[in-house]
Amino acid sequence: MEKDLSSLYSEKKDKENDETLFNIKLSKSVVETTPLNGHSLFDDDKSLSDWTDNVFTQSVFYHGSDDLIWGKFFVCVYKSPNSNKLNAIIFDKLGTSCFESVDISSNSQYYPAIENLSPSDQESNVKKCIAVILLQRYPLLSPSDLSQILSNKSENCDYDPPYAGDLASSCQLITAVPPEDLGKRFFTSGLLQNRFVSSTLLDVIYENNESTIELNNRLVFHLGEQLEQLFNPVTEYSPEQTEYGYKAPEDELPTESDDDLVKAICNELLQLQTNFTFNLVEFLQKFLIALRVRVLNEEINGLSTTKLNRLFPPTIDEVTRINCIFLDSLKTAIPYGSLEVLKACSITIPYFYKAYTRHEAATKNFSKDIKLFIRHFSNVIPEREVYTEMKIESIIKGPQEKLLKLKLIIERLWKSKKWRPKNQEMAKKCYNNIIDVIDSFGKLDSPLHSYSTRVFTPSGKILTELAKCWPVELQYKWLKRRVVGVYDVVDLNDENKRNLLVIFSDYVVFINILEAESYYTSDGSNRPLISDILMNSLINEVPLPSKIPKLKVERHCYIDEVLVSILDKSTLRFDRLKGKDSFSMVCKLSSAFISSSSVADLITKARILEKDTAFHLFKASRSHFTLYSTAHELCAYDSEKIKSKFALFLNIPPSKEILEVNNLHLAFFARFCSNDGRDNIVILDVLTKHDDKHIEVTSDNIVFTIINQLAIEIPICFSSLNSSMAKDLLCVNENLIKNLEHQLEEVKHPSTDEHRAVNSKLSGASDFDATHEKKRSYGTITTFRSYTSDLKDSPSGDNSNVTKETKEILPVKPTKKSSKKPREIQKKTKTNASKAEHIEKKKPNKGKGFFGVLKNVFGSKSKSKPSPVQRVPKKISQRHPKSPVKKPMTSEKKSSPKRAVVSSPKIKKKSTSFSTKESQTAKSSLRAVEFKSDDLIGKPPDVGNGAHPQENTRISSVVRDTKYVSYNPSQPVTENTSNEKNVEPKADQSTKQDNISNFADVEVSASSYPEKLDAETDDQIIGKATNSSSVHGNKELPDLAEVTTANRVSTTSAGDQRIDTQSEFLRAADVENLSDDDEHRQNESRVFNDDLFGDFIPKHYRNKQENINSSSNLFPEGKVPQEKGVSNENTNISLKTNEDASTLTQKLSPQASKVLTENSNELKDTNNEGKDAKDIKLGDDYSDKETAKEITKPKNFVEGITERKEIFPTIPRLAPPASKINFQRSPSYIELFQGMRVVLDKHDAHYNWKRLASQVSLSEGLKVNTEEDAAIINKSQDDAKAERMTQISEVIEYEMQQPIPTYLPKAHLDDSGIEKSDDKFFEIEEELKEELKGSKTGNEDVGNNNPSNSIPKIEKPPAFKVIRTSPVRIIGRTFEDTRKYENGSPSDISFTYDTHNNDEPDKRLMELKFPSQDEIPDDRFYTPAEEPTAEFPVEELPNTPRSINVTTSNNKSTDDKLSSGNIDQKPTELLDDLEFSSFNIAFGNTSMSTDNMKISSDLSSNKTVLGNAQKVQESPSGPLIYVLPQSSTKHEKEGFLRKKQKDEPIWVSPSKIDFADLSRRTKALTPERNTVPLKNNDSRKYKYTGEGSIGNMTNMLLTKDASYAYLKDFVALSDDEDEDGKQNCAVGGPEKLKFY
């Protein structure tokens, strides 16, 4: 038996060894070359040390550029140690090509290329080798390959030996970097290593026909294991290995002598950890493990392992393990004193982070799930007496809560202990590390001020700032996005540099950790990985801790555009396959416990998650390769957006059209050999664009056959010119070579510490500091960018020299007069200098006027002292409105070549005319753009930009140090405006800077260039900056470096600057240059640029003057009334509402755009924001003069307001329906907030939600900026019109702000004091109102033609009043108005509701609570402009005011509105909710009287709908209370003042109930007061009055049975009693408080 077992294992081992040989390797070159000897240098998977020892130490590197075929390329030439012959490796857009044993003798068939070398290179064996291989590789290309590779397909390919010889002569030796270092860069870029694919996706397509269902199922059965879930929770929750552990001191002596208090604290810490750990262990042993065993044995019906693991995830095991380790560490450390206790905590507590993070994420819904579990399985769980629901929940939720206790104890230990001086530093370090780790679980020191750089999680929560330059593509779709993985990665060229790899379900993001060395210290302190912290922030929706380093997004790509290949066990290469935007990134995982294959597997899983159609999932593996198969129905597959390049079609006829339609590289067509499927033979047709096969296999081997075929086709698809993605592959390699070239350019000018400091100072606002503080950003909600883009940290005083039109500083370059070069030489040996000339020659028409303009500007001084222009207006984005004032810059391709500075050719000869200091300055300034190690595997500066920058444009941070870039030593400020028109556009300059190829001083004979250039280009100047003799123009070079550095702070090149930041810079410039308002507004974006909820709650001020001043600064004179629709005297004031919904984003009213900040420091920025929003509508109707007038005369403006301060308009307006809102500029707003708008409560914390000023109709009928409207006044308006507007607005304000009118009995109108609310908003409003009333004139009631409508001022005593209630049902009957019996209404009635909200009640609450069981149309309730419905009598329409809950805007004249003083207020605010009736009661100077409360009660409990008292409605769900019929009611009085006794609830035998009558009863609106009238035959209506007596009320109460008195308020009134009860307001009697 033992022999059998051992043989079995040995066979299995041999089989595994065979399987390890199976892998899928990608090609290093898109054109495979077969070596002459059959063995390639790449056959062996060499390590970096092998390459360095055998190749790089004996090699030289050359750099060249070919415009015809190869593009930019590098050549490595070395001598083979075996054959003593020259070998060569070429790196270019084809990949890596190796040429061994190159024959450079005269017998070589490629010797003609050597003959065409320049005379100086004829003796160089290296140049001979390069010439031979350049000619040798050309015949290896087929015509089809050549057509794809040619840079310019329109030109004829004249590639011959002379061309190859000239191209070899033009190659330059690279001496800036040692060959070993340069070889390492190629190695770490993945150009020399073998790349493997570990997993891929196969789409399986089937037709849903009954005839093929069974056959399809049989075929799918052999595709591998079917998975129920993509991520296996057991493997995902695998424990984290502890790399560090606490060890006791070796000398076994205490390091600290502790007193009794400190010892007690340490023992308390040990006791807490002991108890908690024992509880966890006991829970696992006695409950969870026992339950798992029973479930595995299938002893519990209905409970599977999957369900159990979902409720009790394996993370609890991991948490228990970490707590056990911590307990062991504490037990070991306590005998050695308090310092060792801190050390043990500092080492062990960081392991809590990952375990607790995953545990919290896995138990989010535990409270709900455990209730369901206990309900169904309480009788089968072990020890159910001990482990109750509360006990289990406390154990599962305990770990997070215990952390706070640990923190408190450790803080007490730190404060109570007096540390020895030698231990003070170590103790502080350990203590800080412990606190930082615990705080990393989620601590928000300050409220979130703004939302511009936040990320919305799936549940709608807002995270703190994640990273600078957050991609625009990731600002929305968070409801669907999932976080798949976050990993720390290391830069291969700099081990101290850390990056982050974030894998979402739809995007892969590469993030730089700025100043990572400050976090990952080498002192042995154990800290959580930043990847774990970010994962916790994303998964558990907690803010990032304040002490992690700043993050900056470097790259990102869509999940379906990325190709992942494995370089070794811990290194991966990510290639984005997207044309010109392609790039390549190499990442090495920092953790040794995570394999590269597992990360590559997650990329495949993320692609599966991104699929948007239904599928079945299968998994098959062979060796280290995993195949995921997703089975789609044919119709669903047609609409699928995530499609693999490989597909399997079941029982579908083969067709190559399917390849074209679905963009497939490979298609399998499988079917059984016989129709009945009895035999297991499967016919497999394999189709590609270039070949097809016909294979017959058994059904068991179908998946292995597919994998074998994929092993052949995957390298062709992803690394060959035969692929449909050949252009993308070429672009990846081309951009990779450009990136290496850019790195070498930076290395050639190494940055000294001094220039590093300068560069750091320049980018100080751009780069994050180590304190991750929360700052306010003034950007838009649709932009995820850093707060530094708003120039919040820029010195305010440095903008004094900023020109008005400046948006971006561009480098200024001297222009040289170029001479013509022969065409054939340009073709064959075009260098970067000739490229620059070629760019100049494209625009000969604009070049002549150039010197004339410059001569006028500079005169003769320009020859010797060229004055650089400081700034150039940036090209206006295509999506911005065209400026009528300034002419926009043309596109980059056609930009003008004019420059502001010209260097005469004579300057070229003055190589020694500078002082030593100036020469050093020129040199150092060229090195201002330092080489950063984080760019070694990064992107080239101009990748994907080219001539179409808008395709790649996203909002990013641009930081300018205005103090630095405004330095202008040689040009006065007065020349700024004259130079602005003569500045070279950004495109030409960035193009030239990026084409630098002079990496070293290379010997090039003059014979290779027939004509000597008369002038050198800037690139040549920069390329030879290290040679002082070749540096020219001491005045221009420092500025050139300055502006170049400023432009490259946040990106690697000036070409990476994004045009979308111009509005941010413009807004910052407005703070200092307010007089430039109109010029700035011409270029301002039309996107909403304000805080999303800026005006949600009106801001309050310390005094009225501050309110007026801050408001007056927002809107210049003469602008506000033009926005208002003011017509004749009888026209209601309203906003213009006939605009389309989309116009709201472009025509914002001043009311909707102003934002009043709470402090004066923020007022300036907010002021400019208000202007920006306003300017969008005002356009250029207002000049700078008007703006300046407003700014220079704020005092007069304030005085104007003071004179008419009674104008406090509350402007009614018609809000468009929410369904018509379409914010075309902000798709993320629609996705994130359109469904959320009804749940944002204005009584939330003020820092959470702010009213969006520009979106008037976020909530139907809600007024905007009621309190601030006093500041929106047109000073230039004539006095008569202003006075008229004052009178109208006062009346309208009263009507809008009136609550449901209620009146106290006259007996209560005494002189008792008025007790005001303590609410600050209410006090301010009350104060303002009193002053407004004091300034009223005798014309207060102008327009009110009804003398009975006069409103006497009646002082009212304090009383309770209902200021807010839940909604009630809209009824169909009306009642007489009690106010017809009153002489007037109180004058101060407008402040009787909602002390928190000074404009209107919150209608969003009504949207949520409105019980729409009667199917009442929304337009009846929310559309104020609609005509009254038939339920309301026509004769009462004039007396119907505009409801408080509905903002109306009708055509009634002001006189008509004021004449309706005696109005029947439909109490739509006193509304009942179905389940919970809510109300607010305030104690103010006016009160709701009993009779009006009775009206509200009658309306609430009215059973009639649309006037039909007998309408049958559904039965109420609450208990029934029976009331006596009206006929048995006694009446004490007759006639108008007749009163009746209230019915008493009685018990009725069920046998006496008329069930037919029950079925016809009306529905009760409130379930807690459902009543059933037994007989309701009396339909008489009783009029009511405000008169009554206390005696009548007292007699009525005394006649009742005391035993039923407590039920009185809970019994709803019947119809007749409702009517008669309205007289209940007895004069002089005590007011009875009623609740609804």
Swiss-Prot record:
Keyword Cell cycle: yes
Biased composition (Low complexity): 912-921
Biased composition (Basic residues): 872-885
Residues bearing the modification Phosphoserine: 766, 1063, 1075, 1134, 1149, 1160, 1228, 1254, 1257, 1390, 1412, 1443, 1501, 1549, 1589, 1614
Post-translational modification Phosphothreonine, affected residues: T1045, T1157, T1429, T1440
Keywords: Cell cycle, Isopeptide bond, Phosphoprotein, Ubl conjugation
Biased amino acid composition, Basic and acidic residues: 981-991, 1161-1179
Ranges for region Disordered: 789-998, 1025-1063, 1107-1130, 1152-1179, 1331-1354, 1435-1465
Function: Co-assembles with BUD4 at bud sites. BUD4 and BUD3 may cooperate to recognize a spatial landmark (the neck filaments) during mitosis and they subsequently become a landmark for establishing the axial budding pattern in G1.
Protein name: Bud site selection protein 3
Organism: Saccharomyces cerevisiae (strain ATCC 204508 / S288c) (Baker's yeast)
Origin organism lineage: Eukaryota, Fungi, Dikarya, Ascomycota, Saccharomycotina
